[in-house]
């Protein structure tokens, strides 16, 4: 098995030391320790395209994995079996296939080194938007919390950060920055239009059912927006199950609009975090393609990275699913 591994030095748990640990565990692997997107692009072009690996592992956060996937697409390289090494901050996607953090990643690679050729995998759909593929994309609190949390991390001394932990830092930024800002601002409004096959929704018991009036061209939702987006994985990171129904309907992406007021959402935060269903003002759809139309420019994030403000975005299910190594079943 030919293995290639990218380690992002800018990821929360990425370092040259981690790269050396990986080389000792997998001495035959091609390991690149990079500090910029340009370095990663050069590695893909010079190393991976001429000599395609059978297994490619992304060491970083969700943004690292998404950037690597899209660079492979841009270079016209067929995607090998992919794996996520959760060395980032939230690690929403990586948590679907294994434990995260430096120690957990190294333990997973130790098991991988003894696993042989036939690795267990999980198949995931991908969301496509603005020419990029991603496990999730959206706006509202998810994008704003992300920006606030990253700002908090950069300004928090490492000793305090270790005491607070990732979840503690996330909640600290949520309650000291994002929520106060939202309490005193008017929420945007959004119209969600179905552009694909007839939409499905979910009933109170969690079962997927046809949505009356959900045909192509129909408005699925119109009203206030606190959080909205599409995903093919359950978590946005740190255990936040923002899309608990992401795998409910194969061949569809899960679209969610949470419309509760800031005060109401704050009171329900533990329920939101765990993905409890049903909740008031919560709207779930399963579609192949849709458009979000906003009444103002809003922050938009793709796979954990903010990409700017948008008045309108289209999201669709990418036609080719991806196979991810399931580290929980690697023995």
Regions found by a protein language model. Name each.
Residues 5, 202-206, 215-222, 233, ...:
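ATP/nucleoside-binding phosphotransfer catalytic cores, i.e., glycine-rich phosphate-binding loops
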Residues 60-62, 88, 318:
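A short acidic Gly-Thr/Ser loop motif
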Residues 17, 63, 140, 248-250:
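Conserved active-site and cofactor/substrate-binding residues in soluble primary-metabolism enzymes
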Residues 6-7, 15-16, 32-36, 74, ...:
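Catalytic core of DAGKc-family lipid kinases
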Residues 191-193, 227-231, 254-258:
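Short, conserved beta-strand edge motifs with alternating hydrophobic and charged residues
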Residues 58, 66, 86, 228, ...:
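Aspartyl protease active-site motif detector
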Residues 20-23, 73-74, 150-151, 244-247, ...:
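Short, solvent-exposed amphipathic alpha-helical segments in soluble enzyme
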Residues 1-59, 64-66, 70-77, 103, ...:
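ATP/NTP phosphate-donor binding region
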């Amino acid at each position: 098995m030919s293995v290639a591994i990218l380690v992002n030095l800018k990821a929360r748990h990425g370092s040259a030391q981690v790269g050396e640990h990986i080389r000792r565990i997998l001495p035959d692997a091609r390991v690149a320790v990079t500090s910029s997107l340009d370095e990663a692009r050069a590695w893909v072009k010079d190393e991976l395209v001429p000599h395609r690996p059978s297994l490619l592992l992304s060491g970083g956060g969700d943004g690292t994995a998404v950037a690597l996937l899209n660079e492979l697409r841009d270079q016209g390289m067929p995607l090998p079996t992919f794996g996520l090494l959760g060395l980032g901050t939230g690690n929403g996607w990586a948590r679907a296939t294994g434990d995260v953090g430096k120690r957990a990643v190294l333990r997973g690679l130790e098991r991988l080194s003894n696993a042989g050729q036939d690795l267990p995998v999980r198949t995931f759909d991908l969301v496509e938007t603005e020419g990029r593929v991603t496990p999730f994309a959206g706006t509202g609190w998810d994008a704003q919390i992300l920006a606030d949390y990253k700002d908090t991390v950069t300004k928090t001394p490492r000793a305090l950060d270790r005491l607070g932990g990732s979840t503690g830092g996330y909640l600290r930024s949520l309650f000291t920055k994002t929520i106060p800002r939202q309490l005193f601002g008017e929420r945007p409004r959004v119209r969600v239009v179905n552009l694909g096959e007839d939409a499905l929704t979910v009933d109170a018991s969690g079962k997927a059912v046809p949505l009356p009036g959900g045909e192509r061209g129909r408005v699925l939702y119109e009203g206030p927006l606190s959080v909205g987006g599409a995903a093919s994985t359950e978590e946005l990171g740190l255990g936040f199950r923002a899309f608990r129904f992401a795998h409910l309907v194969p061949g569809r992406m899960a679209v969610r609009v949470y419309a509760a007021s800031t005060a109401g959402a704050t009171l329900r935060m533990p329920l939101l975090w765990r993905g409890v269903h049903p909740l008031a003002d919560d709207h779930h759809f399963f579609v192949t393609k849709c458009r979000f139309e906003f009444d103002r420019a809003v922050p938009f994030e793709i796979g954990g990275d903010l990409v700017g403000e948008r008045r309108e975005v289209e999201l669709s299910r990418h036609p080719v699913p991806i196979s991810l190594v399931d580290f929980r079943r690697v023995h």
